């Protein structure tokens, strides 16, 4: 449990999240309009999206399938009967005057995600519901000083709203939950999880309380658009509430916005209750009935999920849960790893992926799909180290050439003459030269200055241009110096 340090003692975070995940679909939830990102304004708007009189919504079957798959991945209950409701409110970018959502009977209920806390323990975050709804359009306020513009390209795009219970106890847990959920959605292909493009948006409901007290008054922070900002927004809002309570003021239930420049939350509007939206079943849409056959079919189509991969990597490949978690955090990296791990030492491969490859990818600002090194060639590099053909230090040089050119490691080693020297006769000759050239250091070593041993190893490596087998050098050198 993480606490907020107030002037009068410690306070607990109580956090629930609402995630709006844009469904990966070529067309909108109730019309055939395209969902292509960054198209010219109002170029992807049908009569249904614009709410022209007499136009009726037609439910997109693919979006329903994506919601069911997501529910199954969340270990949730798929409701065989669900209903679309009208959520009534006025806003300029909502042409219908209401949003089609699911309030009373959502498509998915009672799911869960396990996250790892800062102490290394697993914690279950319960998911209250997942429901389908349509997105609103976009208001643009910076094109003119006199009026706002409306772009309805986004209006009607299908969303999955995923609502947690208030089980989250720190900003870091909230960030970890969103990262894990985003990764899960990407694995099953129901949402691309791109927060920069708005494909995944997060609202945080935050309250604070003393340990053992009832839940406090909550405030909702809308549309947080990055993992980092989730942490910053929750930290600021919780501290703001603690300061108010400790000064004797009450918390007003309201909706607030997070300012990314000042890292503060500001009042947007008073928080509405469900009654304010006057929910009622949409008369233009029949109830959604889902049969067991469809659920079973979609369940069998699910790929291996991140938690399943972690379990496999720890059992089959002997990885730590931490390392396995890093590998599965990106589906393309997990796929790359599996292709290479079947051909070499998986633990050594993991170390090289995390310390060397990830560093180069970050430096080049590219993803693993753009990497010139094939999984097979990466496995060859690991095997060259394993069988003592090259040293670890030389391997780093070979790796850098591979990353830049895409050349196979064995060809680089051959062309550059980088094969490791493991011949005792050759190494003994070099060691004899080093000892002869450093007689004073030898006397100091023999008089008890053991730390000089590293100096002699370095001299041997220098003479062999780092091609000497370091294990063999240590063995032969020790024999010579201790004799």
From Swiss-Prot:
Species annotation: Rickettsia typhi (strain ATCC VR-144 / Wilmington)
Subunit (UniProt): Heterotrimer of A, B and C subunits.
EC number: 6.3.5.-
CC terms in the record's Gene Ontology section: glutamyl-tRNA(Gln) amidotransferase complex
UniProt entry keywords in alphabetical sequence: ATP-binding, Ligase, Nucleotide-binding, Protein biosynthesis
Lipid metabolism as UniProt keyword: no
Name of protein: Aspartyl/glutamyl-tRNA(Asn/Gln) amidotransferase subunit B
Its biological purpose: Allows the formation of correctly charged Asn-tRNA(Asn) or Gln-tRNA(Gln) through the transamidation of misacylated Asp-tRNA(Asn) or Glu-tRNA(Gln) in organisms which lack either or both of asparaginyl-tRNA or glutaminyl-tRNA synthetases. The reaction takes place in the presence of glutamine and ATP through an activated phospho-Asp-tRNA(Asn) or phospho-Glu-tRNA(Gln).
């Amino acid at each position: 449990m993480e606490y907020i340090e107030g002037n009068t003692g410690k306070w607990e975070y109580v956090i629930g999240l609402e995630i709006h995940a844009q469904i990966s679909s070529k067309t909108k939830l109730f019309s055939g309009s395209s969902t292509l990102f960054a198209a010219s304004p109002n170029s992807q708007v049908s009569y249904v999206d614009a709410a022209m009189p007499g136009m009726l919504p037609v439910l997109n079957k693919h979006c329903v399938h994506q919601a069911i798959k997501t529910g199954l991945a969340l270990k949730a209950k798929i409701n065989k009967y669900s209903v679309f409701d009208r959520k009534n409110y006025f806003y300029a970018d909502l042409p219908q005057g209401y949003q089609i959502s699911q309030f009373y009977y959502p498509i998915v209920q009672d799911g869960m995600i396990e996250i790892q806390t800062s102490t290394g323990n697993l914690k279950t975050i319960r998911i209250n519901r997942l429901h389908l709804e349509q997105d609103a359009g976009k208001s643009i306020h910076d094109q003119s000083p006199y009026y706002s513009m409306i772009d309805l390209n986004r209006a009607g795009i299908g969303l999955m709203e995923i609502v947690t219970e208030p089980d989250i106890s720190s900003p870091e847990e909230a960030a970890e939950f969103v990262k894990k959920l985003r990764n899960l959605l990407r694995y099953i292909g129901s949402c691309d999880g791109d927060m920069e493009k708005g494909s995944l948006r997060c609202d945080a409901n935050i309250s604070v309380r003393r340990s053992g007290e009832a839940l406090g008054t909550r405030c909702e922070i809308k549309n947080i658009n990055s993992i980092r900002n989730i942490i910053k927004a929750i930290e600021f809002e919780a501290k703001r509430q603690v300061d108010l309570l400790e000064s004797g003021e009450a918390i007003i239930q309201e909706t607030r916005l997070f300012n990314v420049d000042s890292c503060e939350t500001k009042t947007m509007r008073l928080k509405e209750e469900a009654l304010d939206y006057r929910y009622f079943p949409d008369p233009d849409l029949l109830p959604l009935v889902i049969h067991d056959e469809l659920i079973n079919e979609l369940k069998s189509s699910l790929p291996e999920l991140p938690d399943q991969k972690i379990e496999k990597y720890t059992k089959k490949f002997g990885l730590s849960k931490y390392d396995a978690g890093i590998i599965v955090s990106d589906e393309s990296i997990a796929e790359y790893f599996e292709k290479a791990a079947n051909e070499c030492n998986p633990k050594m491969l993991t170390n090289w992926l995390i310390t060397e490859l990830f560093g180069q990818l970050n430096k080049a600002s590219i993803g693993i799909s753009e990497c010139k090194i094939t999984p097979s060639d990466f496995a060859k590099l690991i095997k060259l180290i394993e069988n003592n053909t090259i040293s670890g230090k030389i391997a780093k040089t070979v790796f850098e050439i591979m990353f830049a050119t895409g050349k196979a490691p064995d060809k680089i080693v051959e062309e550059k003459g980088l094969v490791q020297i493991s011949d005792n006769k050759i190494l003994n000759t070099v060691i004899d030269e080093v000892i002869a050239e450093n007689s004073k250091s030898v006397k100091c070593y023999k008089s008890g200055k053991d730390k000089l041993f590293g100096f002699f190893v370095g001299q041997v490596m220098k003479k062999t241009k780092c091609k000497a087998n370091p294990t063999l050098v240590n063995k032969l050198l020790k024999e010579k110096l201790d004799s």
